[in-house]
Amino acid sequence: MVIKFLSALILLLVTTAAQAERIRDLTSVQGVRQNSLIGYGLVVGLDGTGDQTTQTPFTTQTLNNMLSQLGITVPTGTNMQLKNVAAVMVTASLPPFGRQGQTIDVVVSSMGNAKSLRGGTLLMTPLKGVDSQVYALAQGNILVGGAGASAGGSSVQVNQLNGGRITNGAVIERELPSQFGVGNTLNLQLNDEDFSMAQQIADTINRVRGYGSATALDARTIQVRVPSGNSSQVRFLADIQNMQVNVTPQDAKVVINLRTGSVVMNREVTLDSCAVAQGNLSVTVNRQANVSQPDTPFGGGQTVVTPQTQIDLRQSGGSLQSVRSSASLNNVVRALNALGATPMDLMSILQSMQSAGCLRAKLEII
């Protein structure tokens, strides 16, 4: 009884340690993809926050063209100074196997100098693909996530007001031709290139479906032999995508975002022992205007403004800090926090660590 319990416990621990994931979570089917759509349109119904038509002539031109299509003629030379209209760009993604009559979400972004799109309504806008064919028509009320107010020359704003979203705001009018079901092979594409994972997925499919059913072509592509016909391939892919494979350890990687100052690392990152000295140099410039006036108000003279500039330079830190070898992510974070460096300083420290061979990871700067 004890032996059976220990065997079950060991099997549970081994199963837990080997992290298994479905093939559907690791790959995508080549050719089954989204397609981008774009369009140009008008938003009306704004509460005085639209384009200044004197500075955005394309808004007035678009409005005139739309009115003429509706049978309304605007006299030549009319200066329409409207504040409730804005020219916008509309973008959307056409999903794979999208059918006529289905709805998709659209994103609306101001093109001119409109202050806000809150409360606006997008007029019927054709959405085109790269082949200049119309695949969807967008129209509806815009939902803006930001908020803002202004009065007396002061203003406050939270989030973006010049862009919004229309849920189910476009109707698909044209379907994309699909090659699915044609031929006897399909390619599975890994989300991240990995020779080991590609071969492991091919071996898993071959064990279940028979030798020769799958072949790893490169670090990202696995070619699978499938039966002909749409319904047969759908059933075949449904079975394959639910197969589970053991996930190999990821590559150690540190990602640095220079724009936001953020540093992200995965659990495979390790450190070797090293010593780090980081000096912080700060320069402060203060500029002050001094006003000099004559003492005798009736004796002539002129008021003079003289600028006074003061520059302070401070350098702190610079002490040598020892960083111990760390084999786990928690220890790596603890060692880096012990340096007391800011995120911006940490970027240069990590780059120097990699150059010195102390950081066992790929460094990616975005």
Curated annotation (Swiss-Prot):
<keyword id="KW-0574">Periplasm</keyword>
<comment type="function">
    <text>Assembles around the rod to form the L-ring and probably protects the motor/basal body from shearing forces during rotation.</text>
</comment>
<dbReference type="GO" id="GO:0030288">
    <property type="term" value="C:outer membrane-bounded periplasmic space"/>
</dbReference>
<keyword id="KW-0975">Bacterial flagellum</keyword>
<dbReference type="InterPro" id="IPR001782">
    <property type="entry name" value="Flag_FlgI"/>
</dbReference>
<feature type="signal peptide">
    <location>
        <begin position="1"/>
        <end position="20"/>
    </location>
</feature>
<dbReference type="GO" id="GO:0009428">
    <property type="term" value="C:bacterial-type flagellum basal body, distal rod, P ring"/>
</dbReference>
<protein>
    <recommendedName>
        <fullName>Flagellar P-ring protein</fullName>
    </recommendedName>
</protein>
<comment type="subunit">
    <text>The basal body constitutes a major portion of the flagellar organelle and consists of four rings (L,P,S, and M) mounted on a central rod.</text>
</comment>
<dbReference type="GO" id="GO:0071973">
    <property type="term" value="P:bacterial-type flagellum-dependent cell motility"/>
</dbReference>
<keyword id="KW-0732">Signal</keyword>
<comment type="similarity">
    <text>Belongs to the FlgI family.</text>
</comment>
<dbReference type="Pfam" id="PF02119">
    <property type="entry name" value="FlgI"/>
</dbReference>
<dbReference type="GO" id="GO:0005198">
    <property type="term" value="F:structural molecule activity"/>
</dbReference>
